[in-house]
Swiss-Prot record:
<comment type="similarity">
    <text>Belongs to the universal ribosomal protein uL4 family.</text>
</comment>
<dbReference type="GO" id="GO:0003735">
    <property type="term" value="F:structural constituent of ribosome"/>
</dbReference>
<dbReference type="InterPro" id="IPR002136">
    <property type="entry name" value="Ribosomal_uL4"/>
</dbReference>
<feature type="region of interest" description="Disordered">
    <location>
        <begin position="173"/>
        <end position="210"/>
    </location>
</feature>
<protein>
    <recommendedName>
        <fullName>Large ribosomal subunit protein uL4</fullName>
    </recommendedName>
</protein>
<dbReference type="GO" id="GO:0005840">
    <property type="term" value="C:ribosome"/>
</dbReference>
<comment type="function">
    <text>Forms part of the polypeptide exit tunnel.</text>
</comment>
<keyword id="KW-0689">Ribosomal protein</keyword>
<dbReference type="Pfam" id="PF00573">
    <property type="entry name" value="Ribosomal_L4"/>
</dbReference>
<dbReference type="InterPro" id="IPR023574">
    <property type="entry name" value="Ribosomal_uL4_dom_sf"/>
</dbReference>
<keyword id="KW-0699">rRNA-binding</keyword>
<dbReference type="InterPro" id="IPR045240">
    <property type="entry name" value="Ribosomal_uL4_euk/arch"/>
</dbReference>
<feature type="compositionally biased region" description="Basic residues">
    <location>
        <begin position="177"/>
        <end position="189"/>
    </location>
</feature>
<feature type="region of interest" description="Disordered">
    <location>
        <begin position="72"/>
        <end position="103"/>
    </location>
</feature>
<dbReference type="GO" id="GO:1990904">
    <property type="term" value="C:ribonucleoprotein complex"/>
</dbReference>
<comment type="subunit">
    <text>Part of the 50S ribosomal subunit.</text>
</comment>
<keyword id="KW-0694">RNA-binding</keyword>
Length: 248
């Protein structure tokens, strides 16, 4: 199985033989577990203060007043979960273990399966990516792409090969996030677009484009290839990255 190699102008620069990893069976179940584990393992511990709701001089009036024996301060109930203004019954605990484990062989198979999904045009289209209908996947460009330093140069290559529509889709899809997250450093929600995989170091030229992520063939993971556990990300590979990913 071969893939067309494009030059920086979008022309045909030959072909490259795809390694066997691109023939891996499609396993969305394992990909989902790998992404879920990656997200869980980077969660920050979160919990309520151990003494939250207890720092009050509230006392129980005891018997004889026709009132519940709830500790009160100025006639306001405290400490009791089912009372107004009472403490939380079962608040989140900071010591809770939120990590998830995954067998090494399962994780490796998930990555290989996600890599193979980048070569399936139907899977990539179902994920919502926009690209020219006549574009052959996987999208491979010559190693000259790794020498680019300017964002406009990288965008020009994407336009030449027919993948620039996905950058526009991601840029137009950027919106203010709903909920409290926008006050916690996550103001905008940004759709994912092209993943750029190189051989030596992540591409500096492409990393500032809307929705674009960059990675090396050795370090690309399941979450890069399947954000949100949805496999089939539109991926641009350099020729050397294709050869290097064979060892994954």
């Amino acid at each position: 199985m071969n893939a067309t190699v494009h030059d920086l102008d979008g022309g045909d620069a030959g072909s490259v033989e795809l390694p066997a990893i691109f023939e891996t069976a499609f396993r969305p179940d394992l990909i989902g577990r790998a992404v879920s584990a990656a997200q869980a393992n980077r969660k920050q511990a979160y919990g309520a203060d151990e003494f939250a709701g207890l720092r009050t001089p509230a006392e129980s009036f005891g018997s004889g007043r026709g009132l519940a024996h709830i500790p009160r301060s100025e006639n306001v109930a405290r400490r009791v979960p089912n009372a107004v203004s009472g403490r939380a019954a079962h608040p989140p605990k900071a010591e809770k273990d939120q990590t998830k484990s995954l067998n090494d062989k399962e994780r490796q198979l998930a990555i290989r399966s996600a890599i193979a999904a980048t070569a399936d045009a139907e899977t990539v289209a179902e994920r919502g990516h926009a690209f020219d209908e006549d574009l052959d996947l996987p999208l491979v460009v010559s190693d000259e792409f790794e020498d680019l330093n300017k964002t406009q140069e990288a965008l020009g290559v994407l336009e030449a090969v027919g993948a620039d529509a996905d950058i526009e889709r991601a840029e137009e899809g950027r919106s203010v996030r709903a909920g409290r997250g926008k006050t916690r450093g996550r103001k905008y929600s940004q759709p994912k677009s092209v993943l750029v995989v190189t051989s030596e170091e992540p591409s500096r030229a492409a990393r500032n484009l809307s929705g674009v992520d960059v990675a090396t063939a050795r370090e690309v993971n399941a979450e890069d290839l399947a954000p949100g556990a949805h496999p089939g990300r539109l991926t641009l590979w350099t020729e050397s990255a294709i050869e290097e990913v064979a060892d994954r």
